């Protein structure tokens, strides 16, 4: 698990050599192949928060951890741990007086008229009156 930086010739060589084996996992196949073939490998041990989000359940779990900073250690308001993202171009979010929102994160461009519990709504999501979103990550446009 991690972030990998390769020169294109080295990566292409490894992938082409492993293609017939259906061996595409970097940690299990590509890195050992590179080591066995004399490529120089370097590592940096990172002790902060990091999660492999290579599966849909893992991506959902990582998003849910944002909603539970006491247990995950994630603090979105930490000045030393800035999160940079592309501006969505959306207006601010709107939460109607009839809406019920608890333990959730609502991003720009969302319109909430229904119920949202323990969920994350990304830009442009609309929750109509009477609708219930619970324990969910909903990605908009």
Question: What is the predicted function of each stretch?
Answer:
Residues 9, 17-141:
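Left-handed beta-helix
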């Amino acid at each position: 698990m991690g972030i990998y930086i390769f020169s294109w010739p080295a990566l292409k060589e490894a992938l082409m050599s492993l293609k017939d084996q259906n061996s595409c996992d970097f940690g299990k196949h590509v890195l050992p192949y590179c080591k066995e073939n004399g490529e120089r490998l370097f590592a940096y041990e990172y002790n902060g928060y990091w999660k492999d989000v290579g599966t849909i359940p893992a991506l959902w779990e990582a998003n849910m951890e944002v909603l539970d900073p006491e247990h995950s250690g994630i603090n979105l308001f930490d000045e030393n741990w800035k999160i940079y993202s592309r501006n969505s171009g959306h207006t601010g979010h709107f939460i109607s007086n009839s809406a019920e929102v608890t333990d959730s994160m609502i991003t720009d461009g969302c319109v909430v008229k229904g119920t949202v519990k323990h969920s994350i709504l990304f830009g442009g999501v609309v929750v109509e009156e009477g609708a219930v979103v619970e324990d969910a990550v909903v990605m908009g446009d």
